[in-house]
């Protein structure tokens, strides 16, 4: 697990882009509001990965919501982690769930969900959803607001 004590933060310094999701470092920082329940949302409107069969690019709009525990996810490290999927071959379901699980394992949130809204390939859009468990009582969680794919219909 990445902590500020074990590895230095990538924030504020030049770092190389990671070549694979496994190589990418996710950083966390202490949550100064750890006694308060609140929601953090990351929107990734231009996620890309590769189809593991054809090597063709796949595109998605990702929404990551989490209720922080003792740690916050540092956004520059998230950007680098997301970019590491650009040449990674995996199915939509695997990419979406892998991202959610990796973030959850690194920052230990009270709750986390990810929505992967994948653009059509072969005429079929695929939406993938994963979460760690039940939403904490009293937490305001807005809808992700990504409309179902309609094409010209």
From Swiss-Prot:
Location of the protein in the cell: Cytoplasm
GO terms of biological process kind: queuosine biosynthetic process; tRNA modification
MF terms (GO), sorted A to Z: preQ1 synthase activity
Classification via SUPFAM superfamilies: Tetrahydrobiopterin biosynthesis enzymes-like (SSF55620)
Gene Ontology cellular-component annotations: cytosol
Listed pathway(s): tRNA modification; tRNA-queuosine biosynthesis
Binding site for substrate: 73-75, 92-93
The keyword ATP-binding is assigned to this record: no
Broad EC category: oxidoreductase
Superkingdom to which the source organism belongs: Bacteria
PANTHER family: NADPH-DEPENDENT 7-CYANO-7-DEAZAGUANINE REDUCTASE (PTHR34354:SF1)
Family note: Belongs to the GTP cyclohydrolase I family. QueF type 1 subfamily.
Free-text function comment from the UniProt entry: Catalyzes the NADPH-dependent reduction of 7-cyano-7-deazaguanine (preQ0) to 7-aminomethyl-7-deazaguanine (preQ1).
Protein name as annotated: NADPH-dependent 7-cyano-7-deazaguanine reductase
Designated gene of the protein: queF
């Amino acid at each position: 697990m990445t902590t500020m004590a074990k590895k230095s933060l990538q924030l504020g310094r030049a770092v190389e882009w990671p070549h694979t999701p496994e190589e990418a470092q996710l950083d966390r920082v202490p949550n100064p509001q750890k006694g308060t329940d609140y929601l953090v949302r990351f929107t990734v409107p231009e996620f890309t990965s590769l189809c593991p069969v054809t090597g063709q690019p796949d595109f998605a709009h990702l929404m990551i919501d989490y209720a922080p525990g003792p740690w916050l996810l540092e956004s520059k490290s998230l950007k680098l982690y997301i970019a590491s999927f650009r040449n990674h071959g995996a199915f939509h379901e695997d990419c979406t769930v892998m991202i959610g699980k990796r973030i959850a394992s690194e920052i230990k949130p009270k709750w986390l969900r990810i929505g992967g809204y994948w653009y059509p390939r072969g005429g079929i859009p695929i939406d993938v959803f994963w979460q760690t468990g039940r939403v904490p009582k009293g937490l305001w969680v807005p809808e992700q607001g990504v409309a179902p794919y309609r094409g010209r219909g």
